[in-house]
Amino acid sequence: MLLLFDHSTPAPLSSYLVGHIVIEARTRGWDRLSNGDLLVEAERAGFEVLVTADKNMRYQPNLKGRKIAIVVLGTPRWPALQMHVDLVAAAVNAAAPGSYTEVEIPKR
């Protein structure tokens, strides 16, 4: 799948998402777009999954009917995520068009 990491997603996570193509929003100049505009541009560009740690994404209007899946990380902190990359990978692998998934990261 073609994945888009927004500005809040730790880049090292990409190496654990085997079999996927990962692009960071900043490389497209999209790191300053609003959530709604980011979703529009990502869909237009053919991205299948947006990976973000922005929990406000759930409040975006019109999430229904979107083609892009959204996976929201429980934390943007790489040390915490690194211990639970299997949870993130499972959520990404299970993502379906238009789905919204929050990945809770257990506290130590």
Protein language model regions, located:
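Acidic, metal-binding active-site segment of PIN/NYN-like and related structure-specific nucleases
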Residues: A42-N62
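Generic structural signal for well-ordered secondary structure
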Residues: N35, L63-K64, L81
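Active-site-adjacent beta-strand anchor residues
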Residues: D6, T52-A53, G74
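Glycine-/small-residue-rich active-site loops that bind phosphorylated ligands and cofactors
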Residues: W30, R58, P76-A80
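N-terminal first-folded block
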Residues: M1-E48
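C-terminal structural segments of small proteins and small subunits
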Residues: I68-R108
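Short loop/helix-cap segments at secondary-structure boundaries that form the rim of catalytic
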Residues: L13-G19, M57-G65
